From Swiss-Prot:
InterPro entries: CBM20, CBM20_beta_amylase, Glyco_hydro_14, Glyco_hydro_14_CS, Glyco_hydro_14A_bac, Glycoside_hydrolase_SF, Ig-like_fold. It catalyses: Hydrolysis of (1->4)-alpha-D-glucosidic linkages in polysaccharides so as to remove successive maltose units from the non-reducing ends of the chains. Residues 448-551 form the CBM20 domain. The lineage of its organism: Bacteria, Bacillati, Bacillota, Clostridia, Thermoanaerobacterales. Optimum temperature is 75 degrees Celsius. Stable at 80 degrees Celsius. Residues 1-32 form the signal peptide. It comes from Thermoanaerobacterium thermosulfurigenes (Clostridium thermosulfurogenes). Its EC number is 3.2.1.2. Its cofactor is Ca(2+). This is Thermophilic beta-amylase.
């Protein structure tokens, strides 16, 4: 963006963006291009709501700030805890009633994973204990390279997995059919943290960032699955030996990597490495196909809404010179194209995380973290394959306006259909008042929503400036910065000095108080004098308001 400046009271000059970067909140909104069905959601609390009146006030605040809906974990560990097919939906019915009363839409997440132990987890909700009595630990849980067993989600090698999910999904559908007016889509959980992945980076098993994590296929069930896959591919052990350069005598000698570090340094490049990693990912895609089929059969006849699943943004070690992509491979992400092919085949929307991050550590040891590059790659694949895709921030955003700008740039540049902010408590206090994070969230992301905002043109007359100074708008609502000049909207353009104009997307029907301010390249602010200006945004069409700068 180029700003116009006055020199010697006469001529207009153009300067680079540098002077305006401090106030980058509106950079992406001025000429934003966004998917026509774009919607903004906020994640509900992890913990149980105990005061639904206060919760309703929080949701009304979301509604008043342009948020379309709230996403909610429907914890398996809550509703079917007493025993198989013994469901208690009372809590979530009260929850859904509150969402409806606040005027929001609802996205239930069928959370068949455990909560606790992962980044951002503040509560502990295990998988129902009776589930683990259905079969052996070897058949039902993941086992990693070091011998650790993981119970964050039921292993895809358990043959009864889809039956368990079918019972859970079917009960939800029958109990919430009367809420289809607010349910706008449904998400299914494909693994830890609700993401389609292996539990490869579990802090409780010693993982620390930016470690590669651990492969999760060392149970007898997993090893047998790998052996059978190779038998199906090659037919004979002689064919395996020819392809791998080995001297095996029986398929029972085939195993996952016995030295993970060596494998991710060298072994992954071999035919064996390709075969192993292709199989390792195929376990996830097969699981996705199975649970998606169950979800469609349970939900489509009742709700007829999109079904989706999430892929984690495993962005570290992306450019590692010694083991590139090792963290992704451990999580099960070997070939994103074939991974997304299953989303397409299963008619699933896809959500991808880490939109708030940048590539500043892309070539910095030990991180080699390239989240922005990864987002672009996966989003381009989704666009090329015609897959509806949505975005999230991976970590809570606090006092970091650039993170919201990063999100907005991804959303507008890569045809995302929606964005979900992590999390309610970050932008709304328990009493329903907004936190300081609401303004940058609304300005950068909510105002991108087509048909959800009204273009209002502000004209500011007689606003004389000196070289390096621009004119902005700041006001009483979140989309005008909540009087915080850090989030002032602008800079305005100056087609006929000293008259300045700017068109802003504002929330329909809101009553605003505002002022013009002048901000120079050093961040110095000059406030307009006099009383606040007032304006009511139209509920449809466009709006305009003209003021004269008050000294």
């Amino acid at each position: 963006m180029i700003g116009a400046f006055k020199r010697l009271g006469q001529k207009l000059f153009l300067t680079l963006l540098t002077a305006s970067l401090i106030f980058a909140s509106s950079i992406v909104t001025a000429n934003a291009s966004i998917a026509p069905n774009f919607k903004v959601f906020v994640m509900g609390p992890l913990e149980k709501v105990t005061d639904f009146n206060a919760f309703k006030d929080q949701l009304i605040t979301l509604k008043n700030n342009g948020v379309y809906g709230i996403t909610t974990d429907i914890w398996w560990g809550y509703v079917e805890n007493a025993g198989e097919n013994q469901f208690d939906w009372s809590y979530y019915k009260t929850y859904a009633d509150t969402v409806r009363a606040a005027g929001l839409k609802w996205v239930p997440i069928m959370s068949t994973h455990a909560c606790g132990g992962n980044v951002g987890d503040t509560v502990n909700i295990p998988i129902p204990s009776w589930v683990w009595t259905k079969d052996t630990q070897d058949n039902m849980q993941y086992k990693d390279e070091a011998g650790n067993w993981d119970n964050e989600a039921v292993s895809p090698w358990y043959s009864g997995l889809t039956q368990l999910y079918n019972e859970f999904y079917s009960s939800f559908a029958s109990n919430f059919s009367s809420y289809k007016d607010i349910i706008t889509k449904i998400y299914i959980s494909g693994g830890p943290s609700g993401e389609l992945r292996y539990p490869s980076y579990n802090p409780s098993h010693g993982w620390t960032y930016p470690g590669r994590g651990s492969l999760q296929c060392y149970s007898k069930a997993a090893i047998t699955s790998f052996q059978n896959a190779m038998k199906s591919k090659y037919g004979t052990i002689a064919a395996v030996n020819s392809a791998w350069g080995t001297s095996l005598t029986d398929f029972s000698q085939i195993s996952p990597p016995t030295d993970g570090d060596n494998f991710f340094t060298n072994g992954y490049k071999t035919t064996y490495g390709n075969d192993f990693l292709t199989w390792y990912q195929s376990v996830l895609t097969n699981e996705l196909a199975n649970i998606a089929s169950v979800a469609h059969s349970c939900f489509d006849p009742v709700f007829n809404v999109p079904i989706g699943a999430k892929i984690a943004g495993v962005h570290w070690l992306y450019n590692s010179p010694t083991m590139p992509h090792a963290a992704e491979y451990c999580a099960g992400y070997y070939n994103y194209s074939t991974l997304l092919d299953q989303f397409k085949a299963s008619n699933l929307a896809m959500t991808f995380t880490c939109l708030e991050m940048d590539d500043s550590n892309a070539y910095v040891s030990p991180y080699y973290s390239a989240p922005m590059t990864l987002v672009h790659y996966v989003a381009n694949l989704a666009n090329n394959k015609g897959i509806v895709h949505n975005g999230e921030n991976a970590l809570a955003i606090s006092n970091n306006n650039q993170a919201y700008v990063n999100c907005a740039n991804e959303l507008t540049g890569y045809n995302f259909s929606g964005f979900t902010l992590l999390r309610l408590s970050n932008i709304v206090n328990s009493d329903g008042s907004v936190t300081s994070e609401m303004a940058p969230f609304v300005i950068n992301i909510v105002t991108l929503t087509p048909n959800g905002t009204i273009p209002v043109t502000f004209t500011i007359n007689n606003a004389t400036t000196y070289y390096g100074q621009n004119v902005y708008i700041v006001g009483s609502t979140s989309d005008l910065g909540n009087w915080n000049t850090t989030y002032a909207r602008g800079p305005a353009s100056c087609p006929n000095y000293p008259t300045w104009t700017i068109t802003l997307n504002l929330l329909p029907g809101e009553q605003i108080q505002f002022k013009a301010v002048k901000i120079d390249s050093s961040g110095n602010v000059t406030w307009e004098g006099g009383s606040n200006h007032t304006y009511t945004v139209p509920t449809s069409g466009t709006g305009s308001v003209t003021i004269t700068w008050q000294n």
